[in-house]
Amino acid sequence: MNATEMVVLLDDAGTPIGEAPKAGVHTLDTPLHLAFSCYLINDVGEVLLTRRSPEKKTWPGVWTNSFCGHPGPGEEFEDAILRRAQFELGVDANKIELVLPHFRYRAIDPTGIVENEVCPVYVARITGVLNPNPAEVADWAWISPALLADALEHTPSAFSPWLGLQFPQLLEANALPLQAGAEA
């Protein structure tokens, strides 16, 4: 990735108001900015979870959705998703579908770093064999939505806060099959 990866800053209405270096926006007083989350689904309806690298600035070592990122200024979401799928997981994303267009959250990690994002949520498929970038992904697993729901209920602290907030909304929107084996 570029050493000067930029993110889009937003006002409270979600309107772009500027840009800033990604490295400088995740602080104790993070400004609202644009991001995305993507959930990869395999042919039997399982969701790819990834465990964040211990090198990550926010929520290191926790399990989360397949991958996340920030579209750069002027970059389309689909292009950002393709870029991050390749960078984080070494695969090409396809069949990209916007499922939660208005998701927004603010969360504070144990070190005090704030996430403050307008973060549309997508589901997609992949082609190729996973080849995770160890600077981004410490581990990964395909899991049924039913098992994920159970894990979130019993061990919520093992997961990123955005996964905990997004997952019930994904189920409500019928974006994920609750039973593995169901065609996604």
From Swiss-Prot:
Pfam families in the record: NUDIX (PF00293)
Cofactor: Mg(2+); Mn(2+)
Catalysis performed (reactions): isopentenyl diphosphate = dimethylallyl diphosphate
Cellular location(s): Cytoplasm
Keyword annotations: Cytoplasm, Isomerase, Isoprene biosynthesis, Magnesium, Manganese, Metal-binding
Residues at which Mn(2+) binds: 26, 33, 70, 115, 117
Ranges where the Nudix hydrolase domain occurs: 31-165
Chief localisation class: cytoplasm
The keyword S-adenosyl-L-methionine belongs to this UniProt entry's keyword annotation: no
Protein name per its UniProtKB record: Isopentenyl-diphosphate Delta-isomerase
Organism: Paenarthrobacter aurescens (strain TC1)
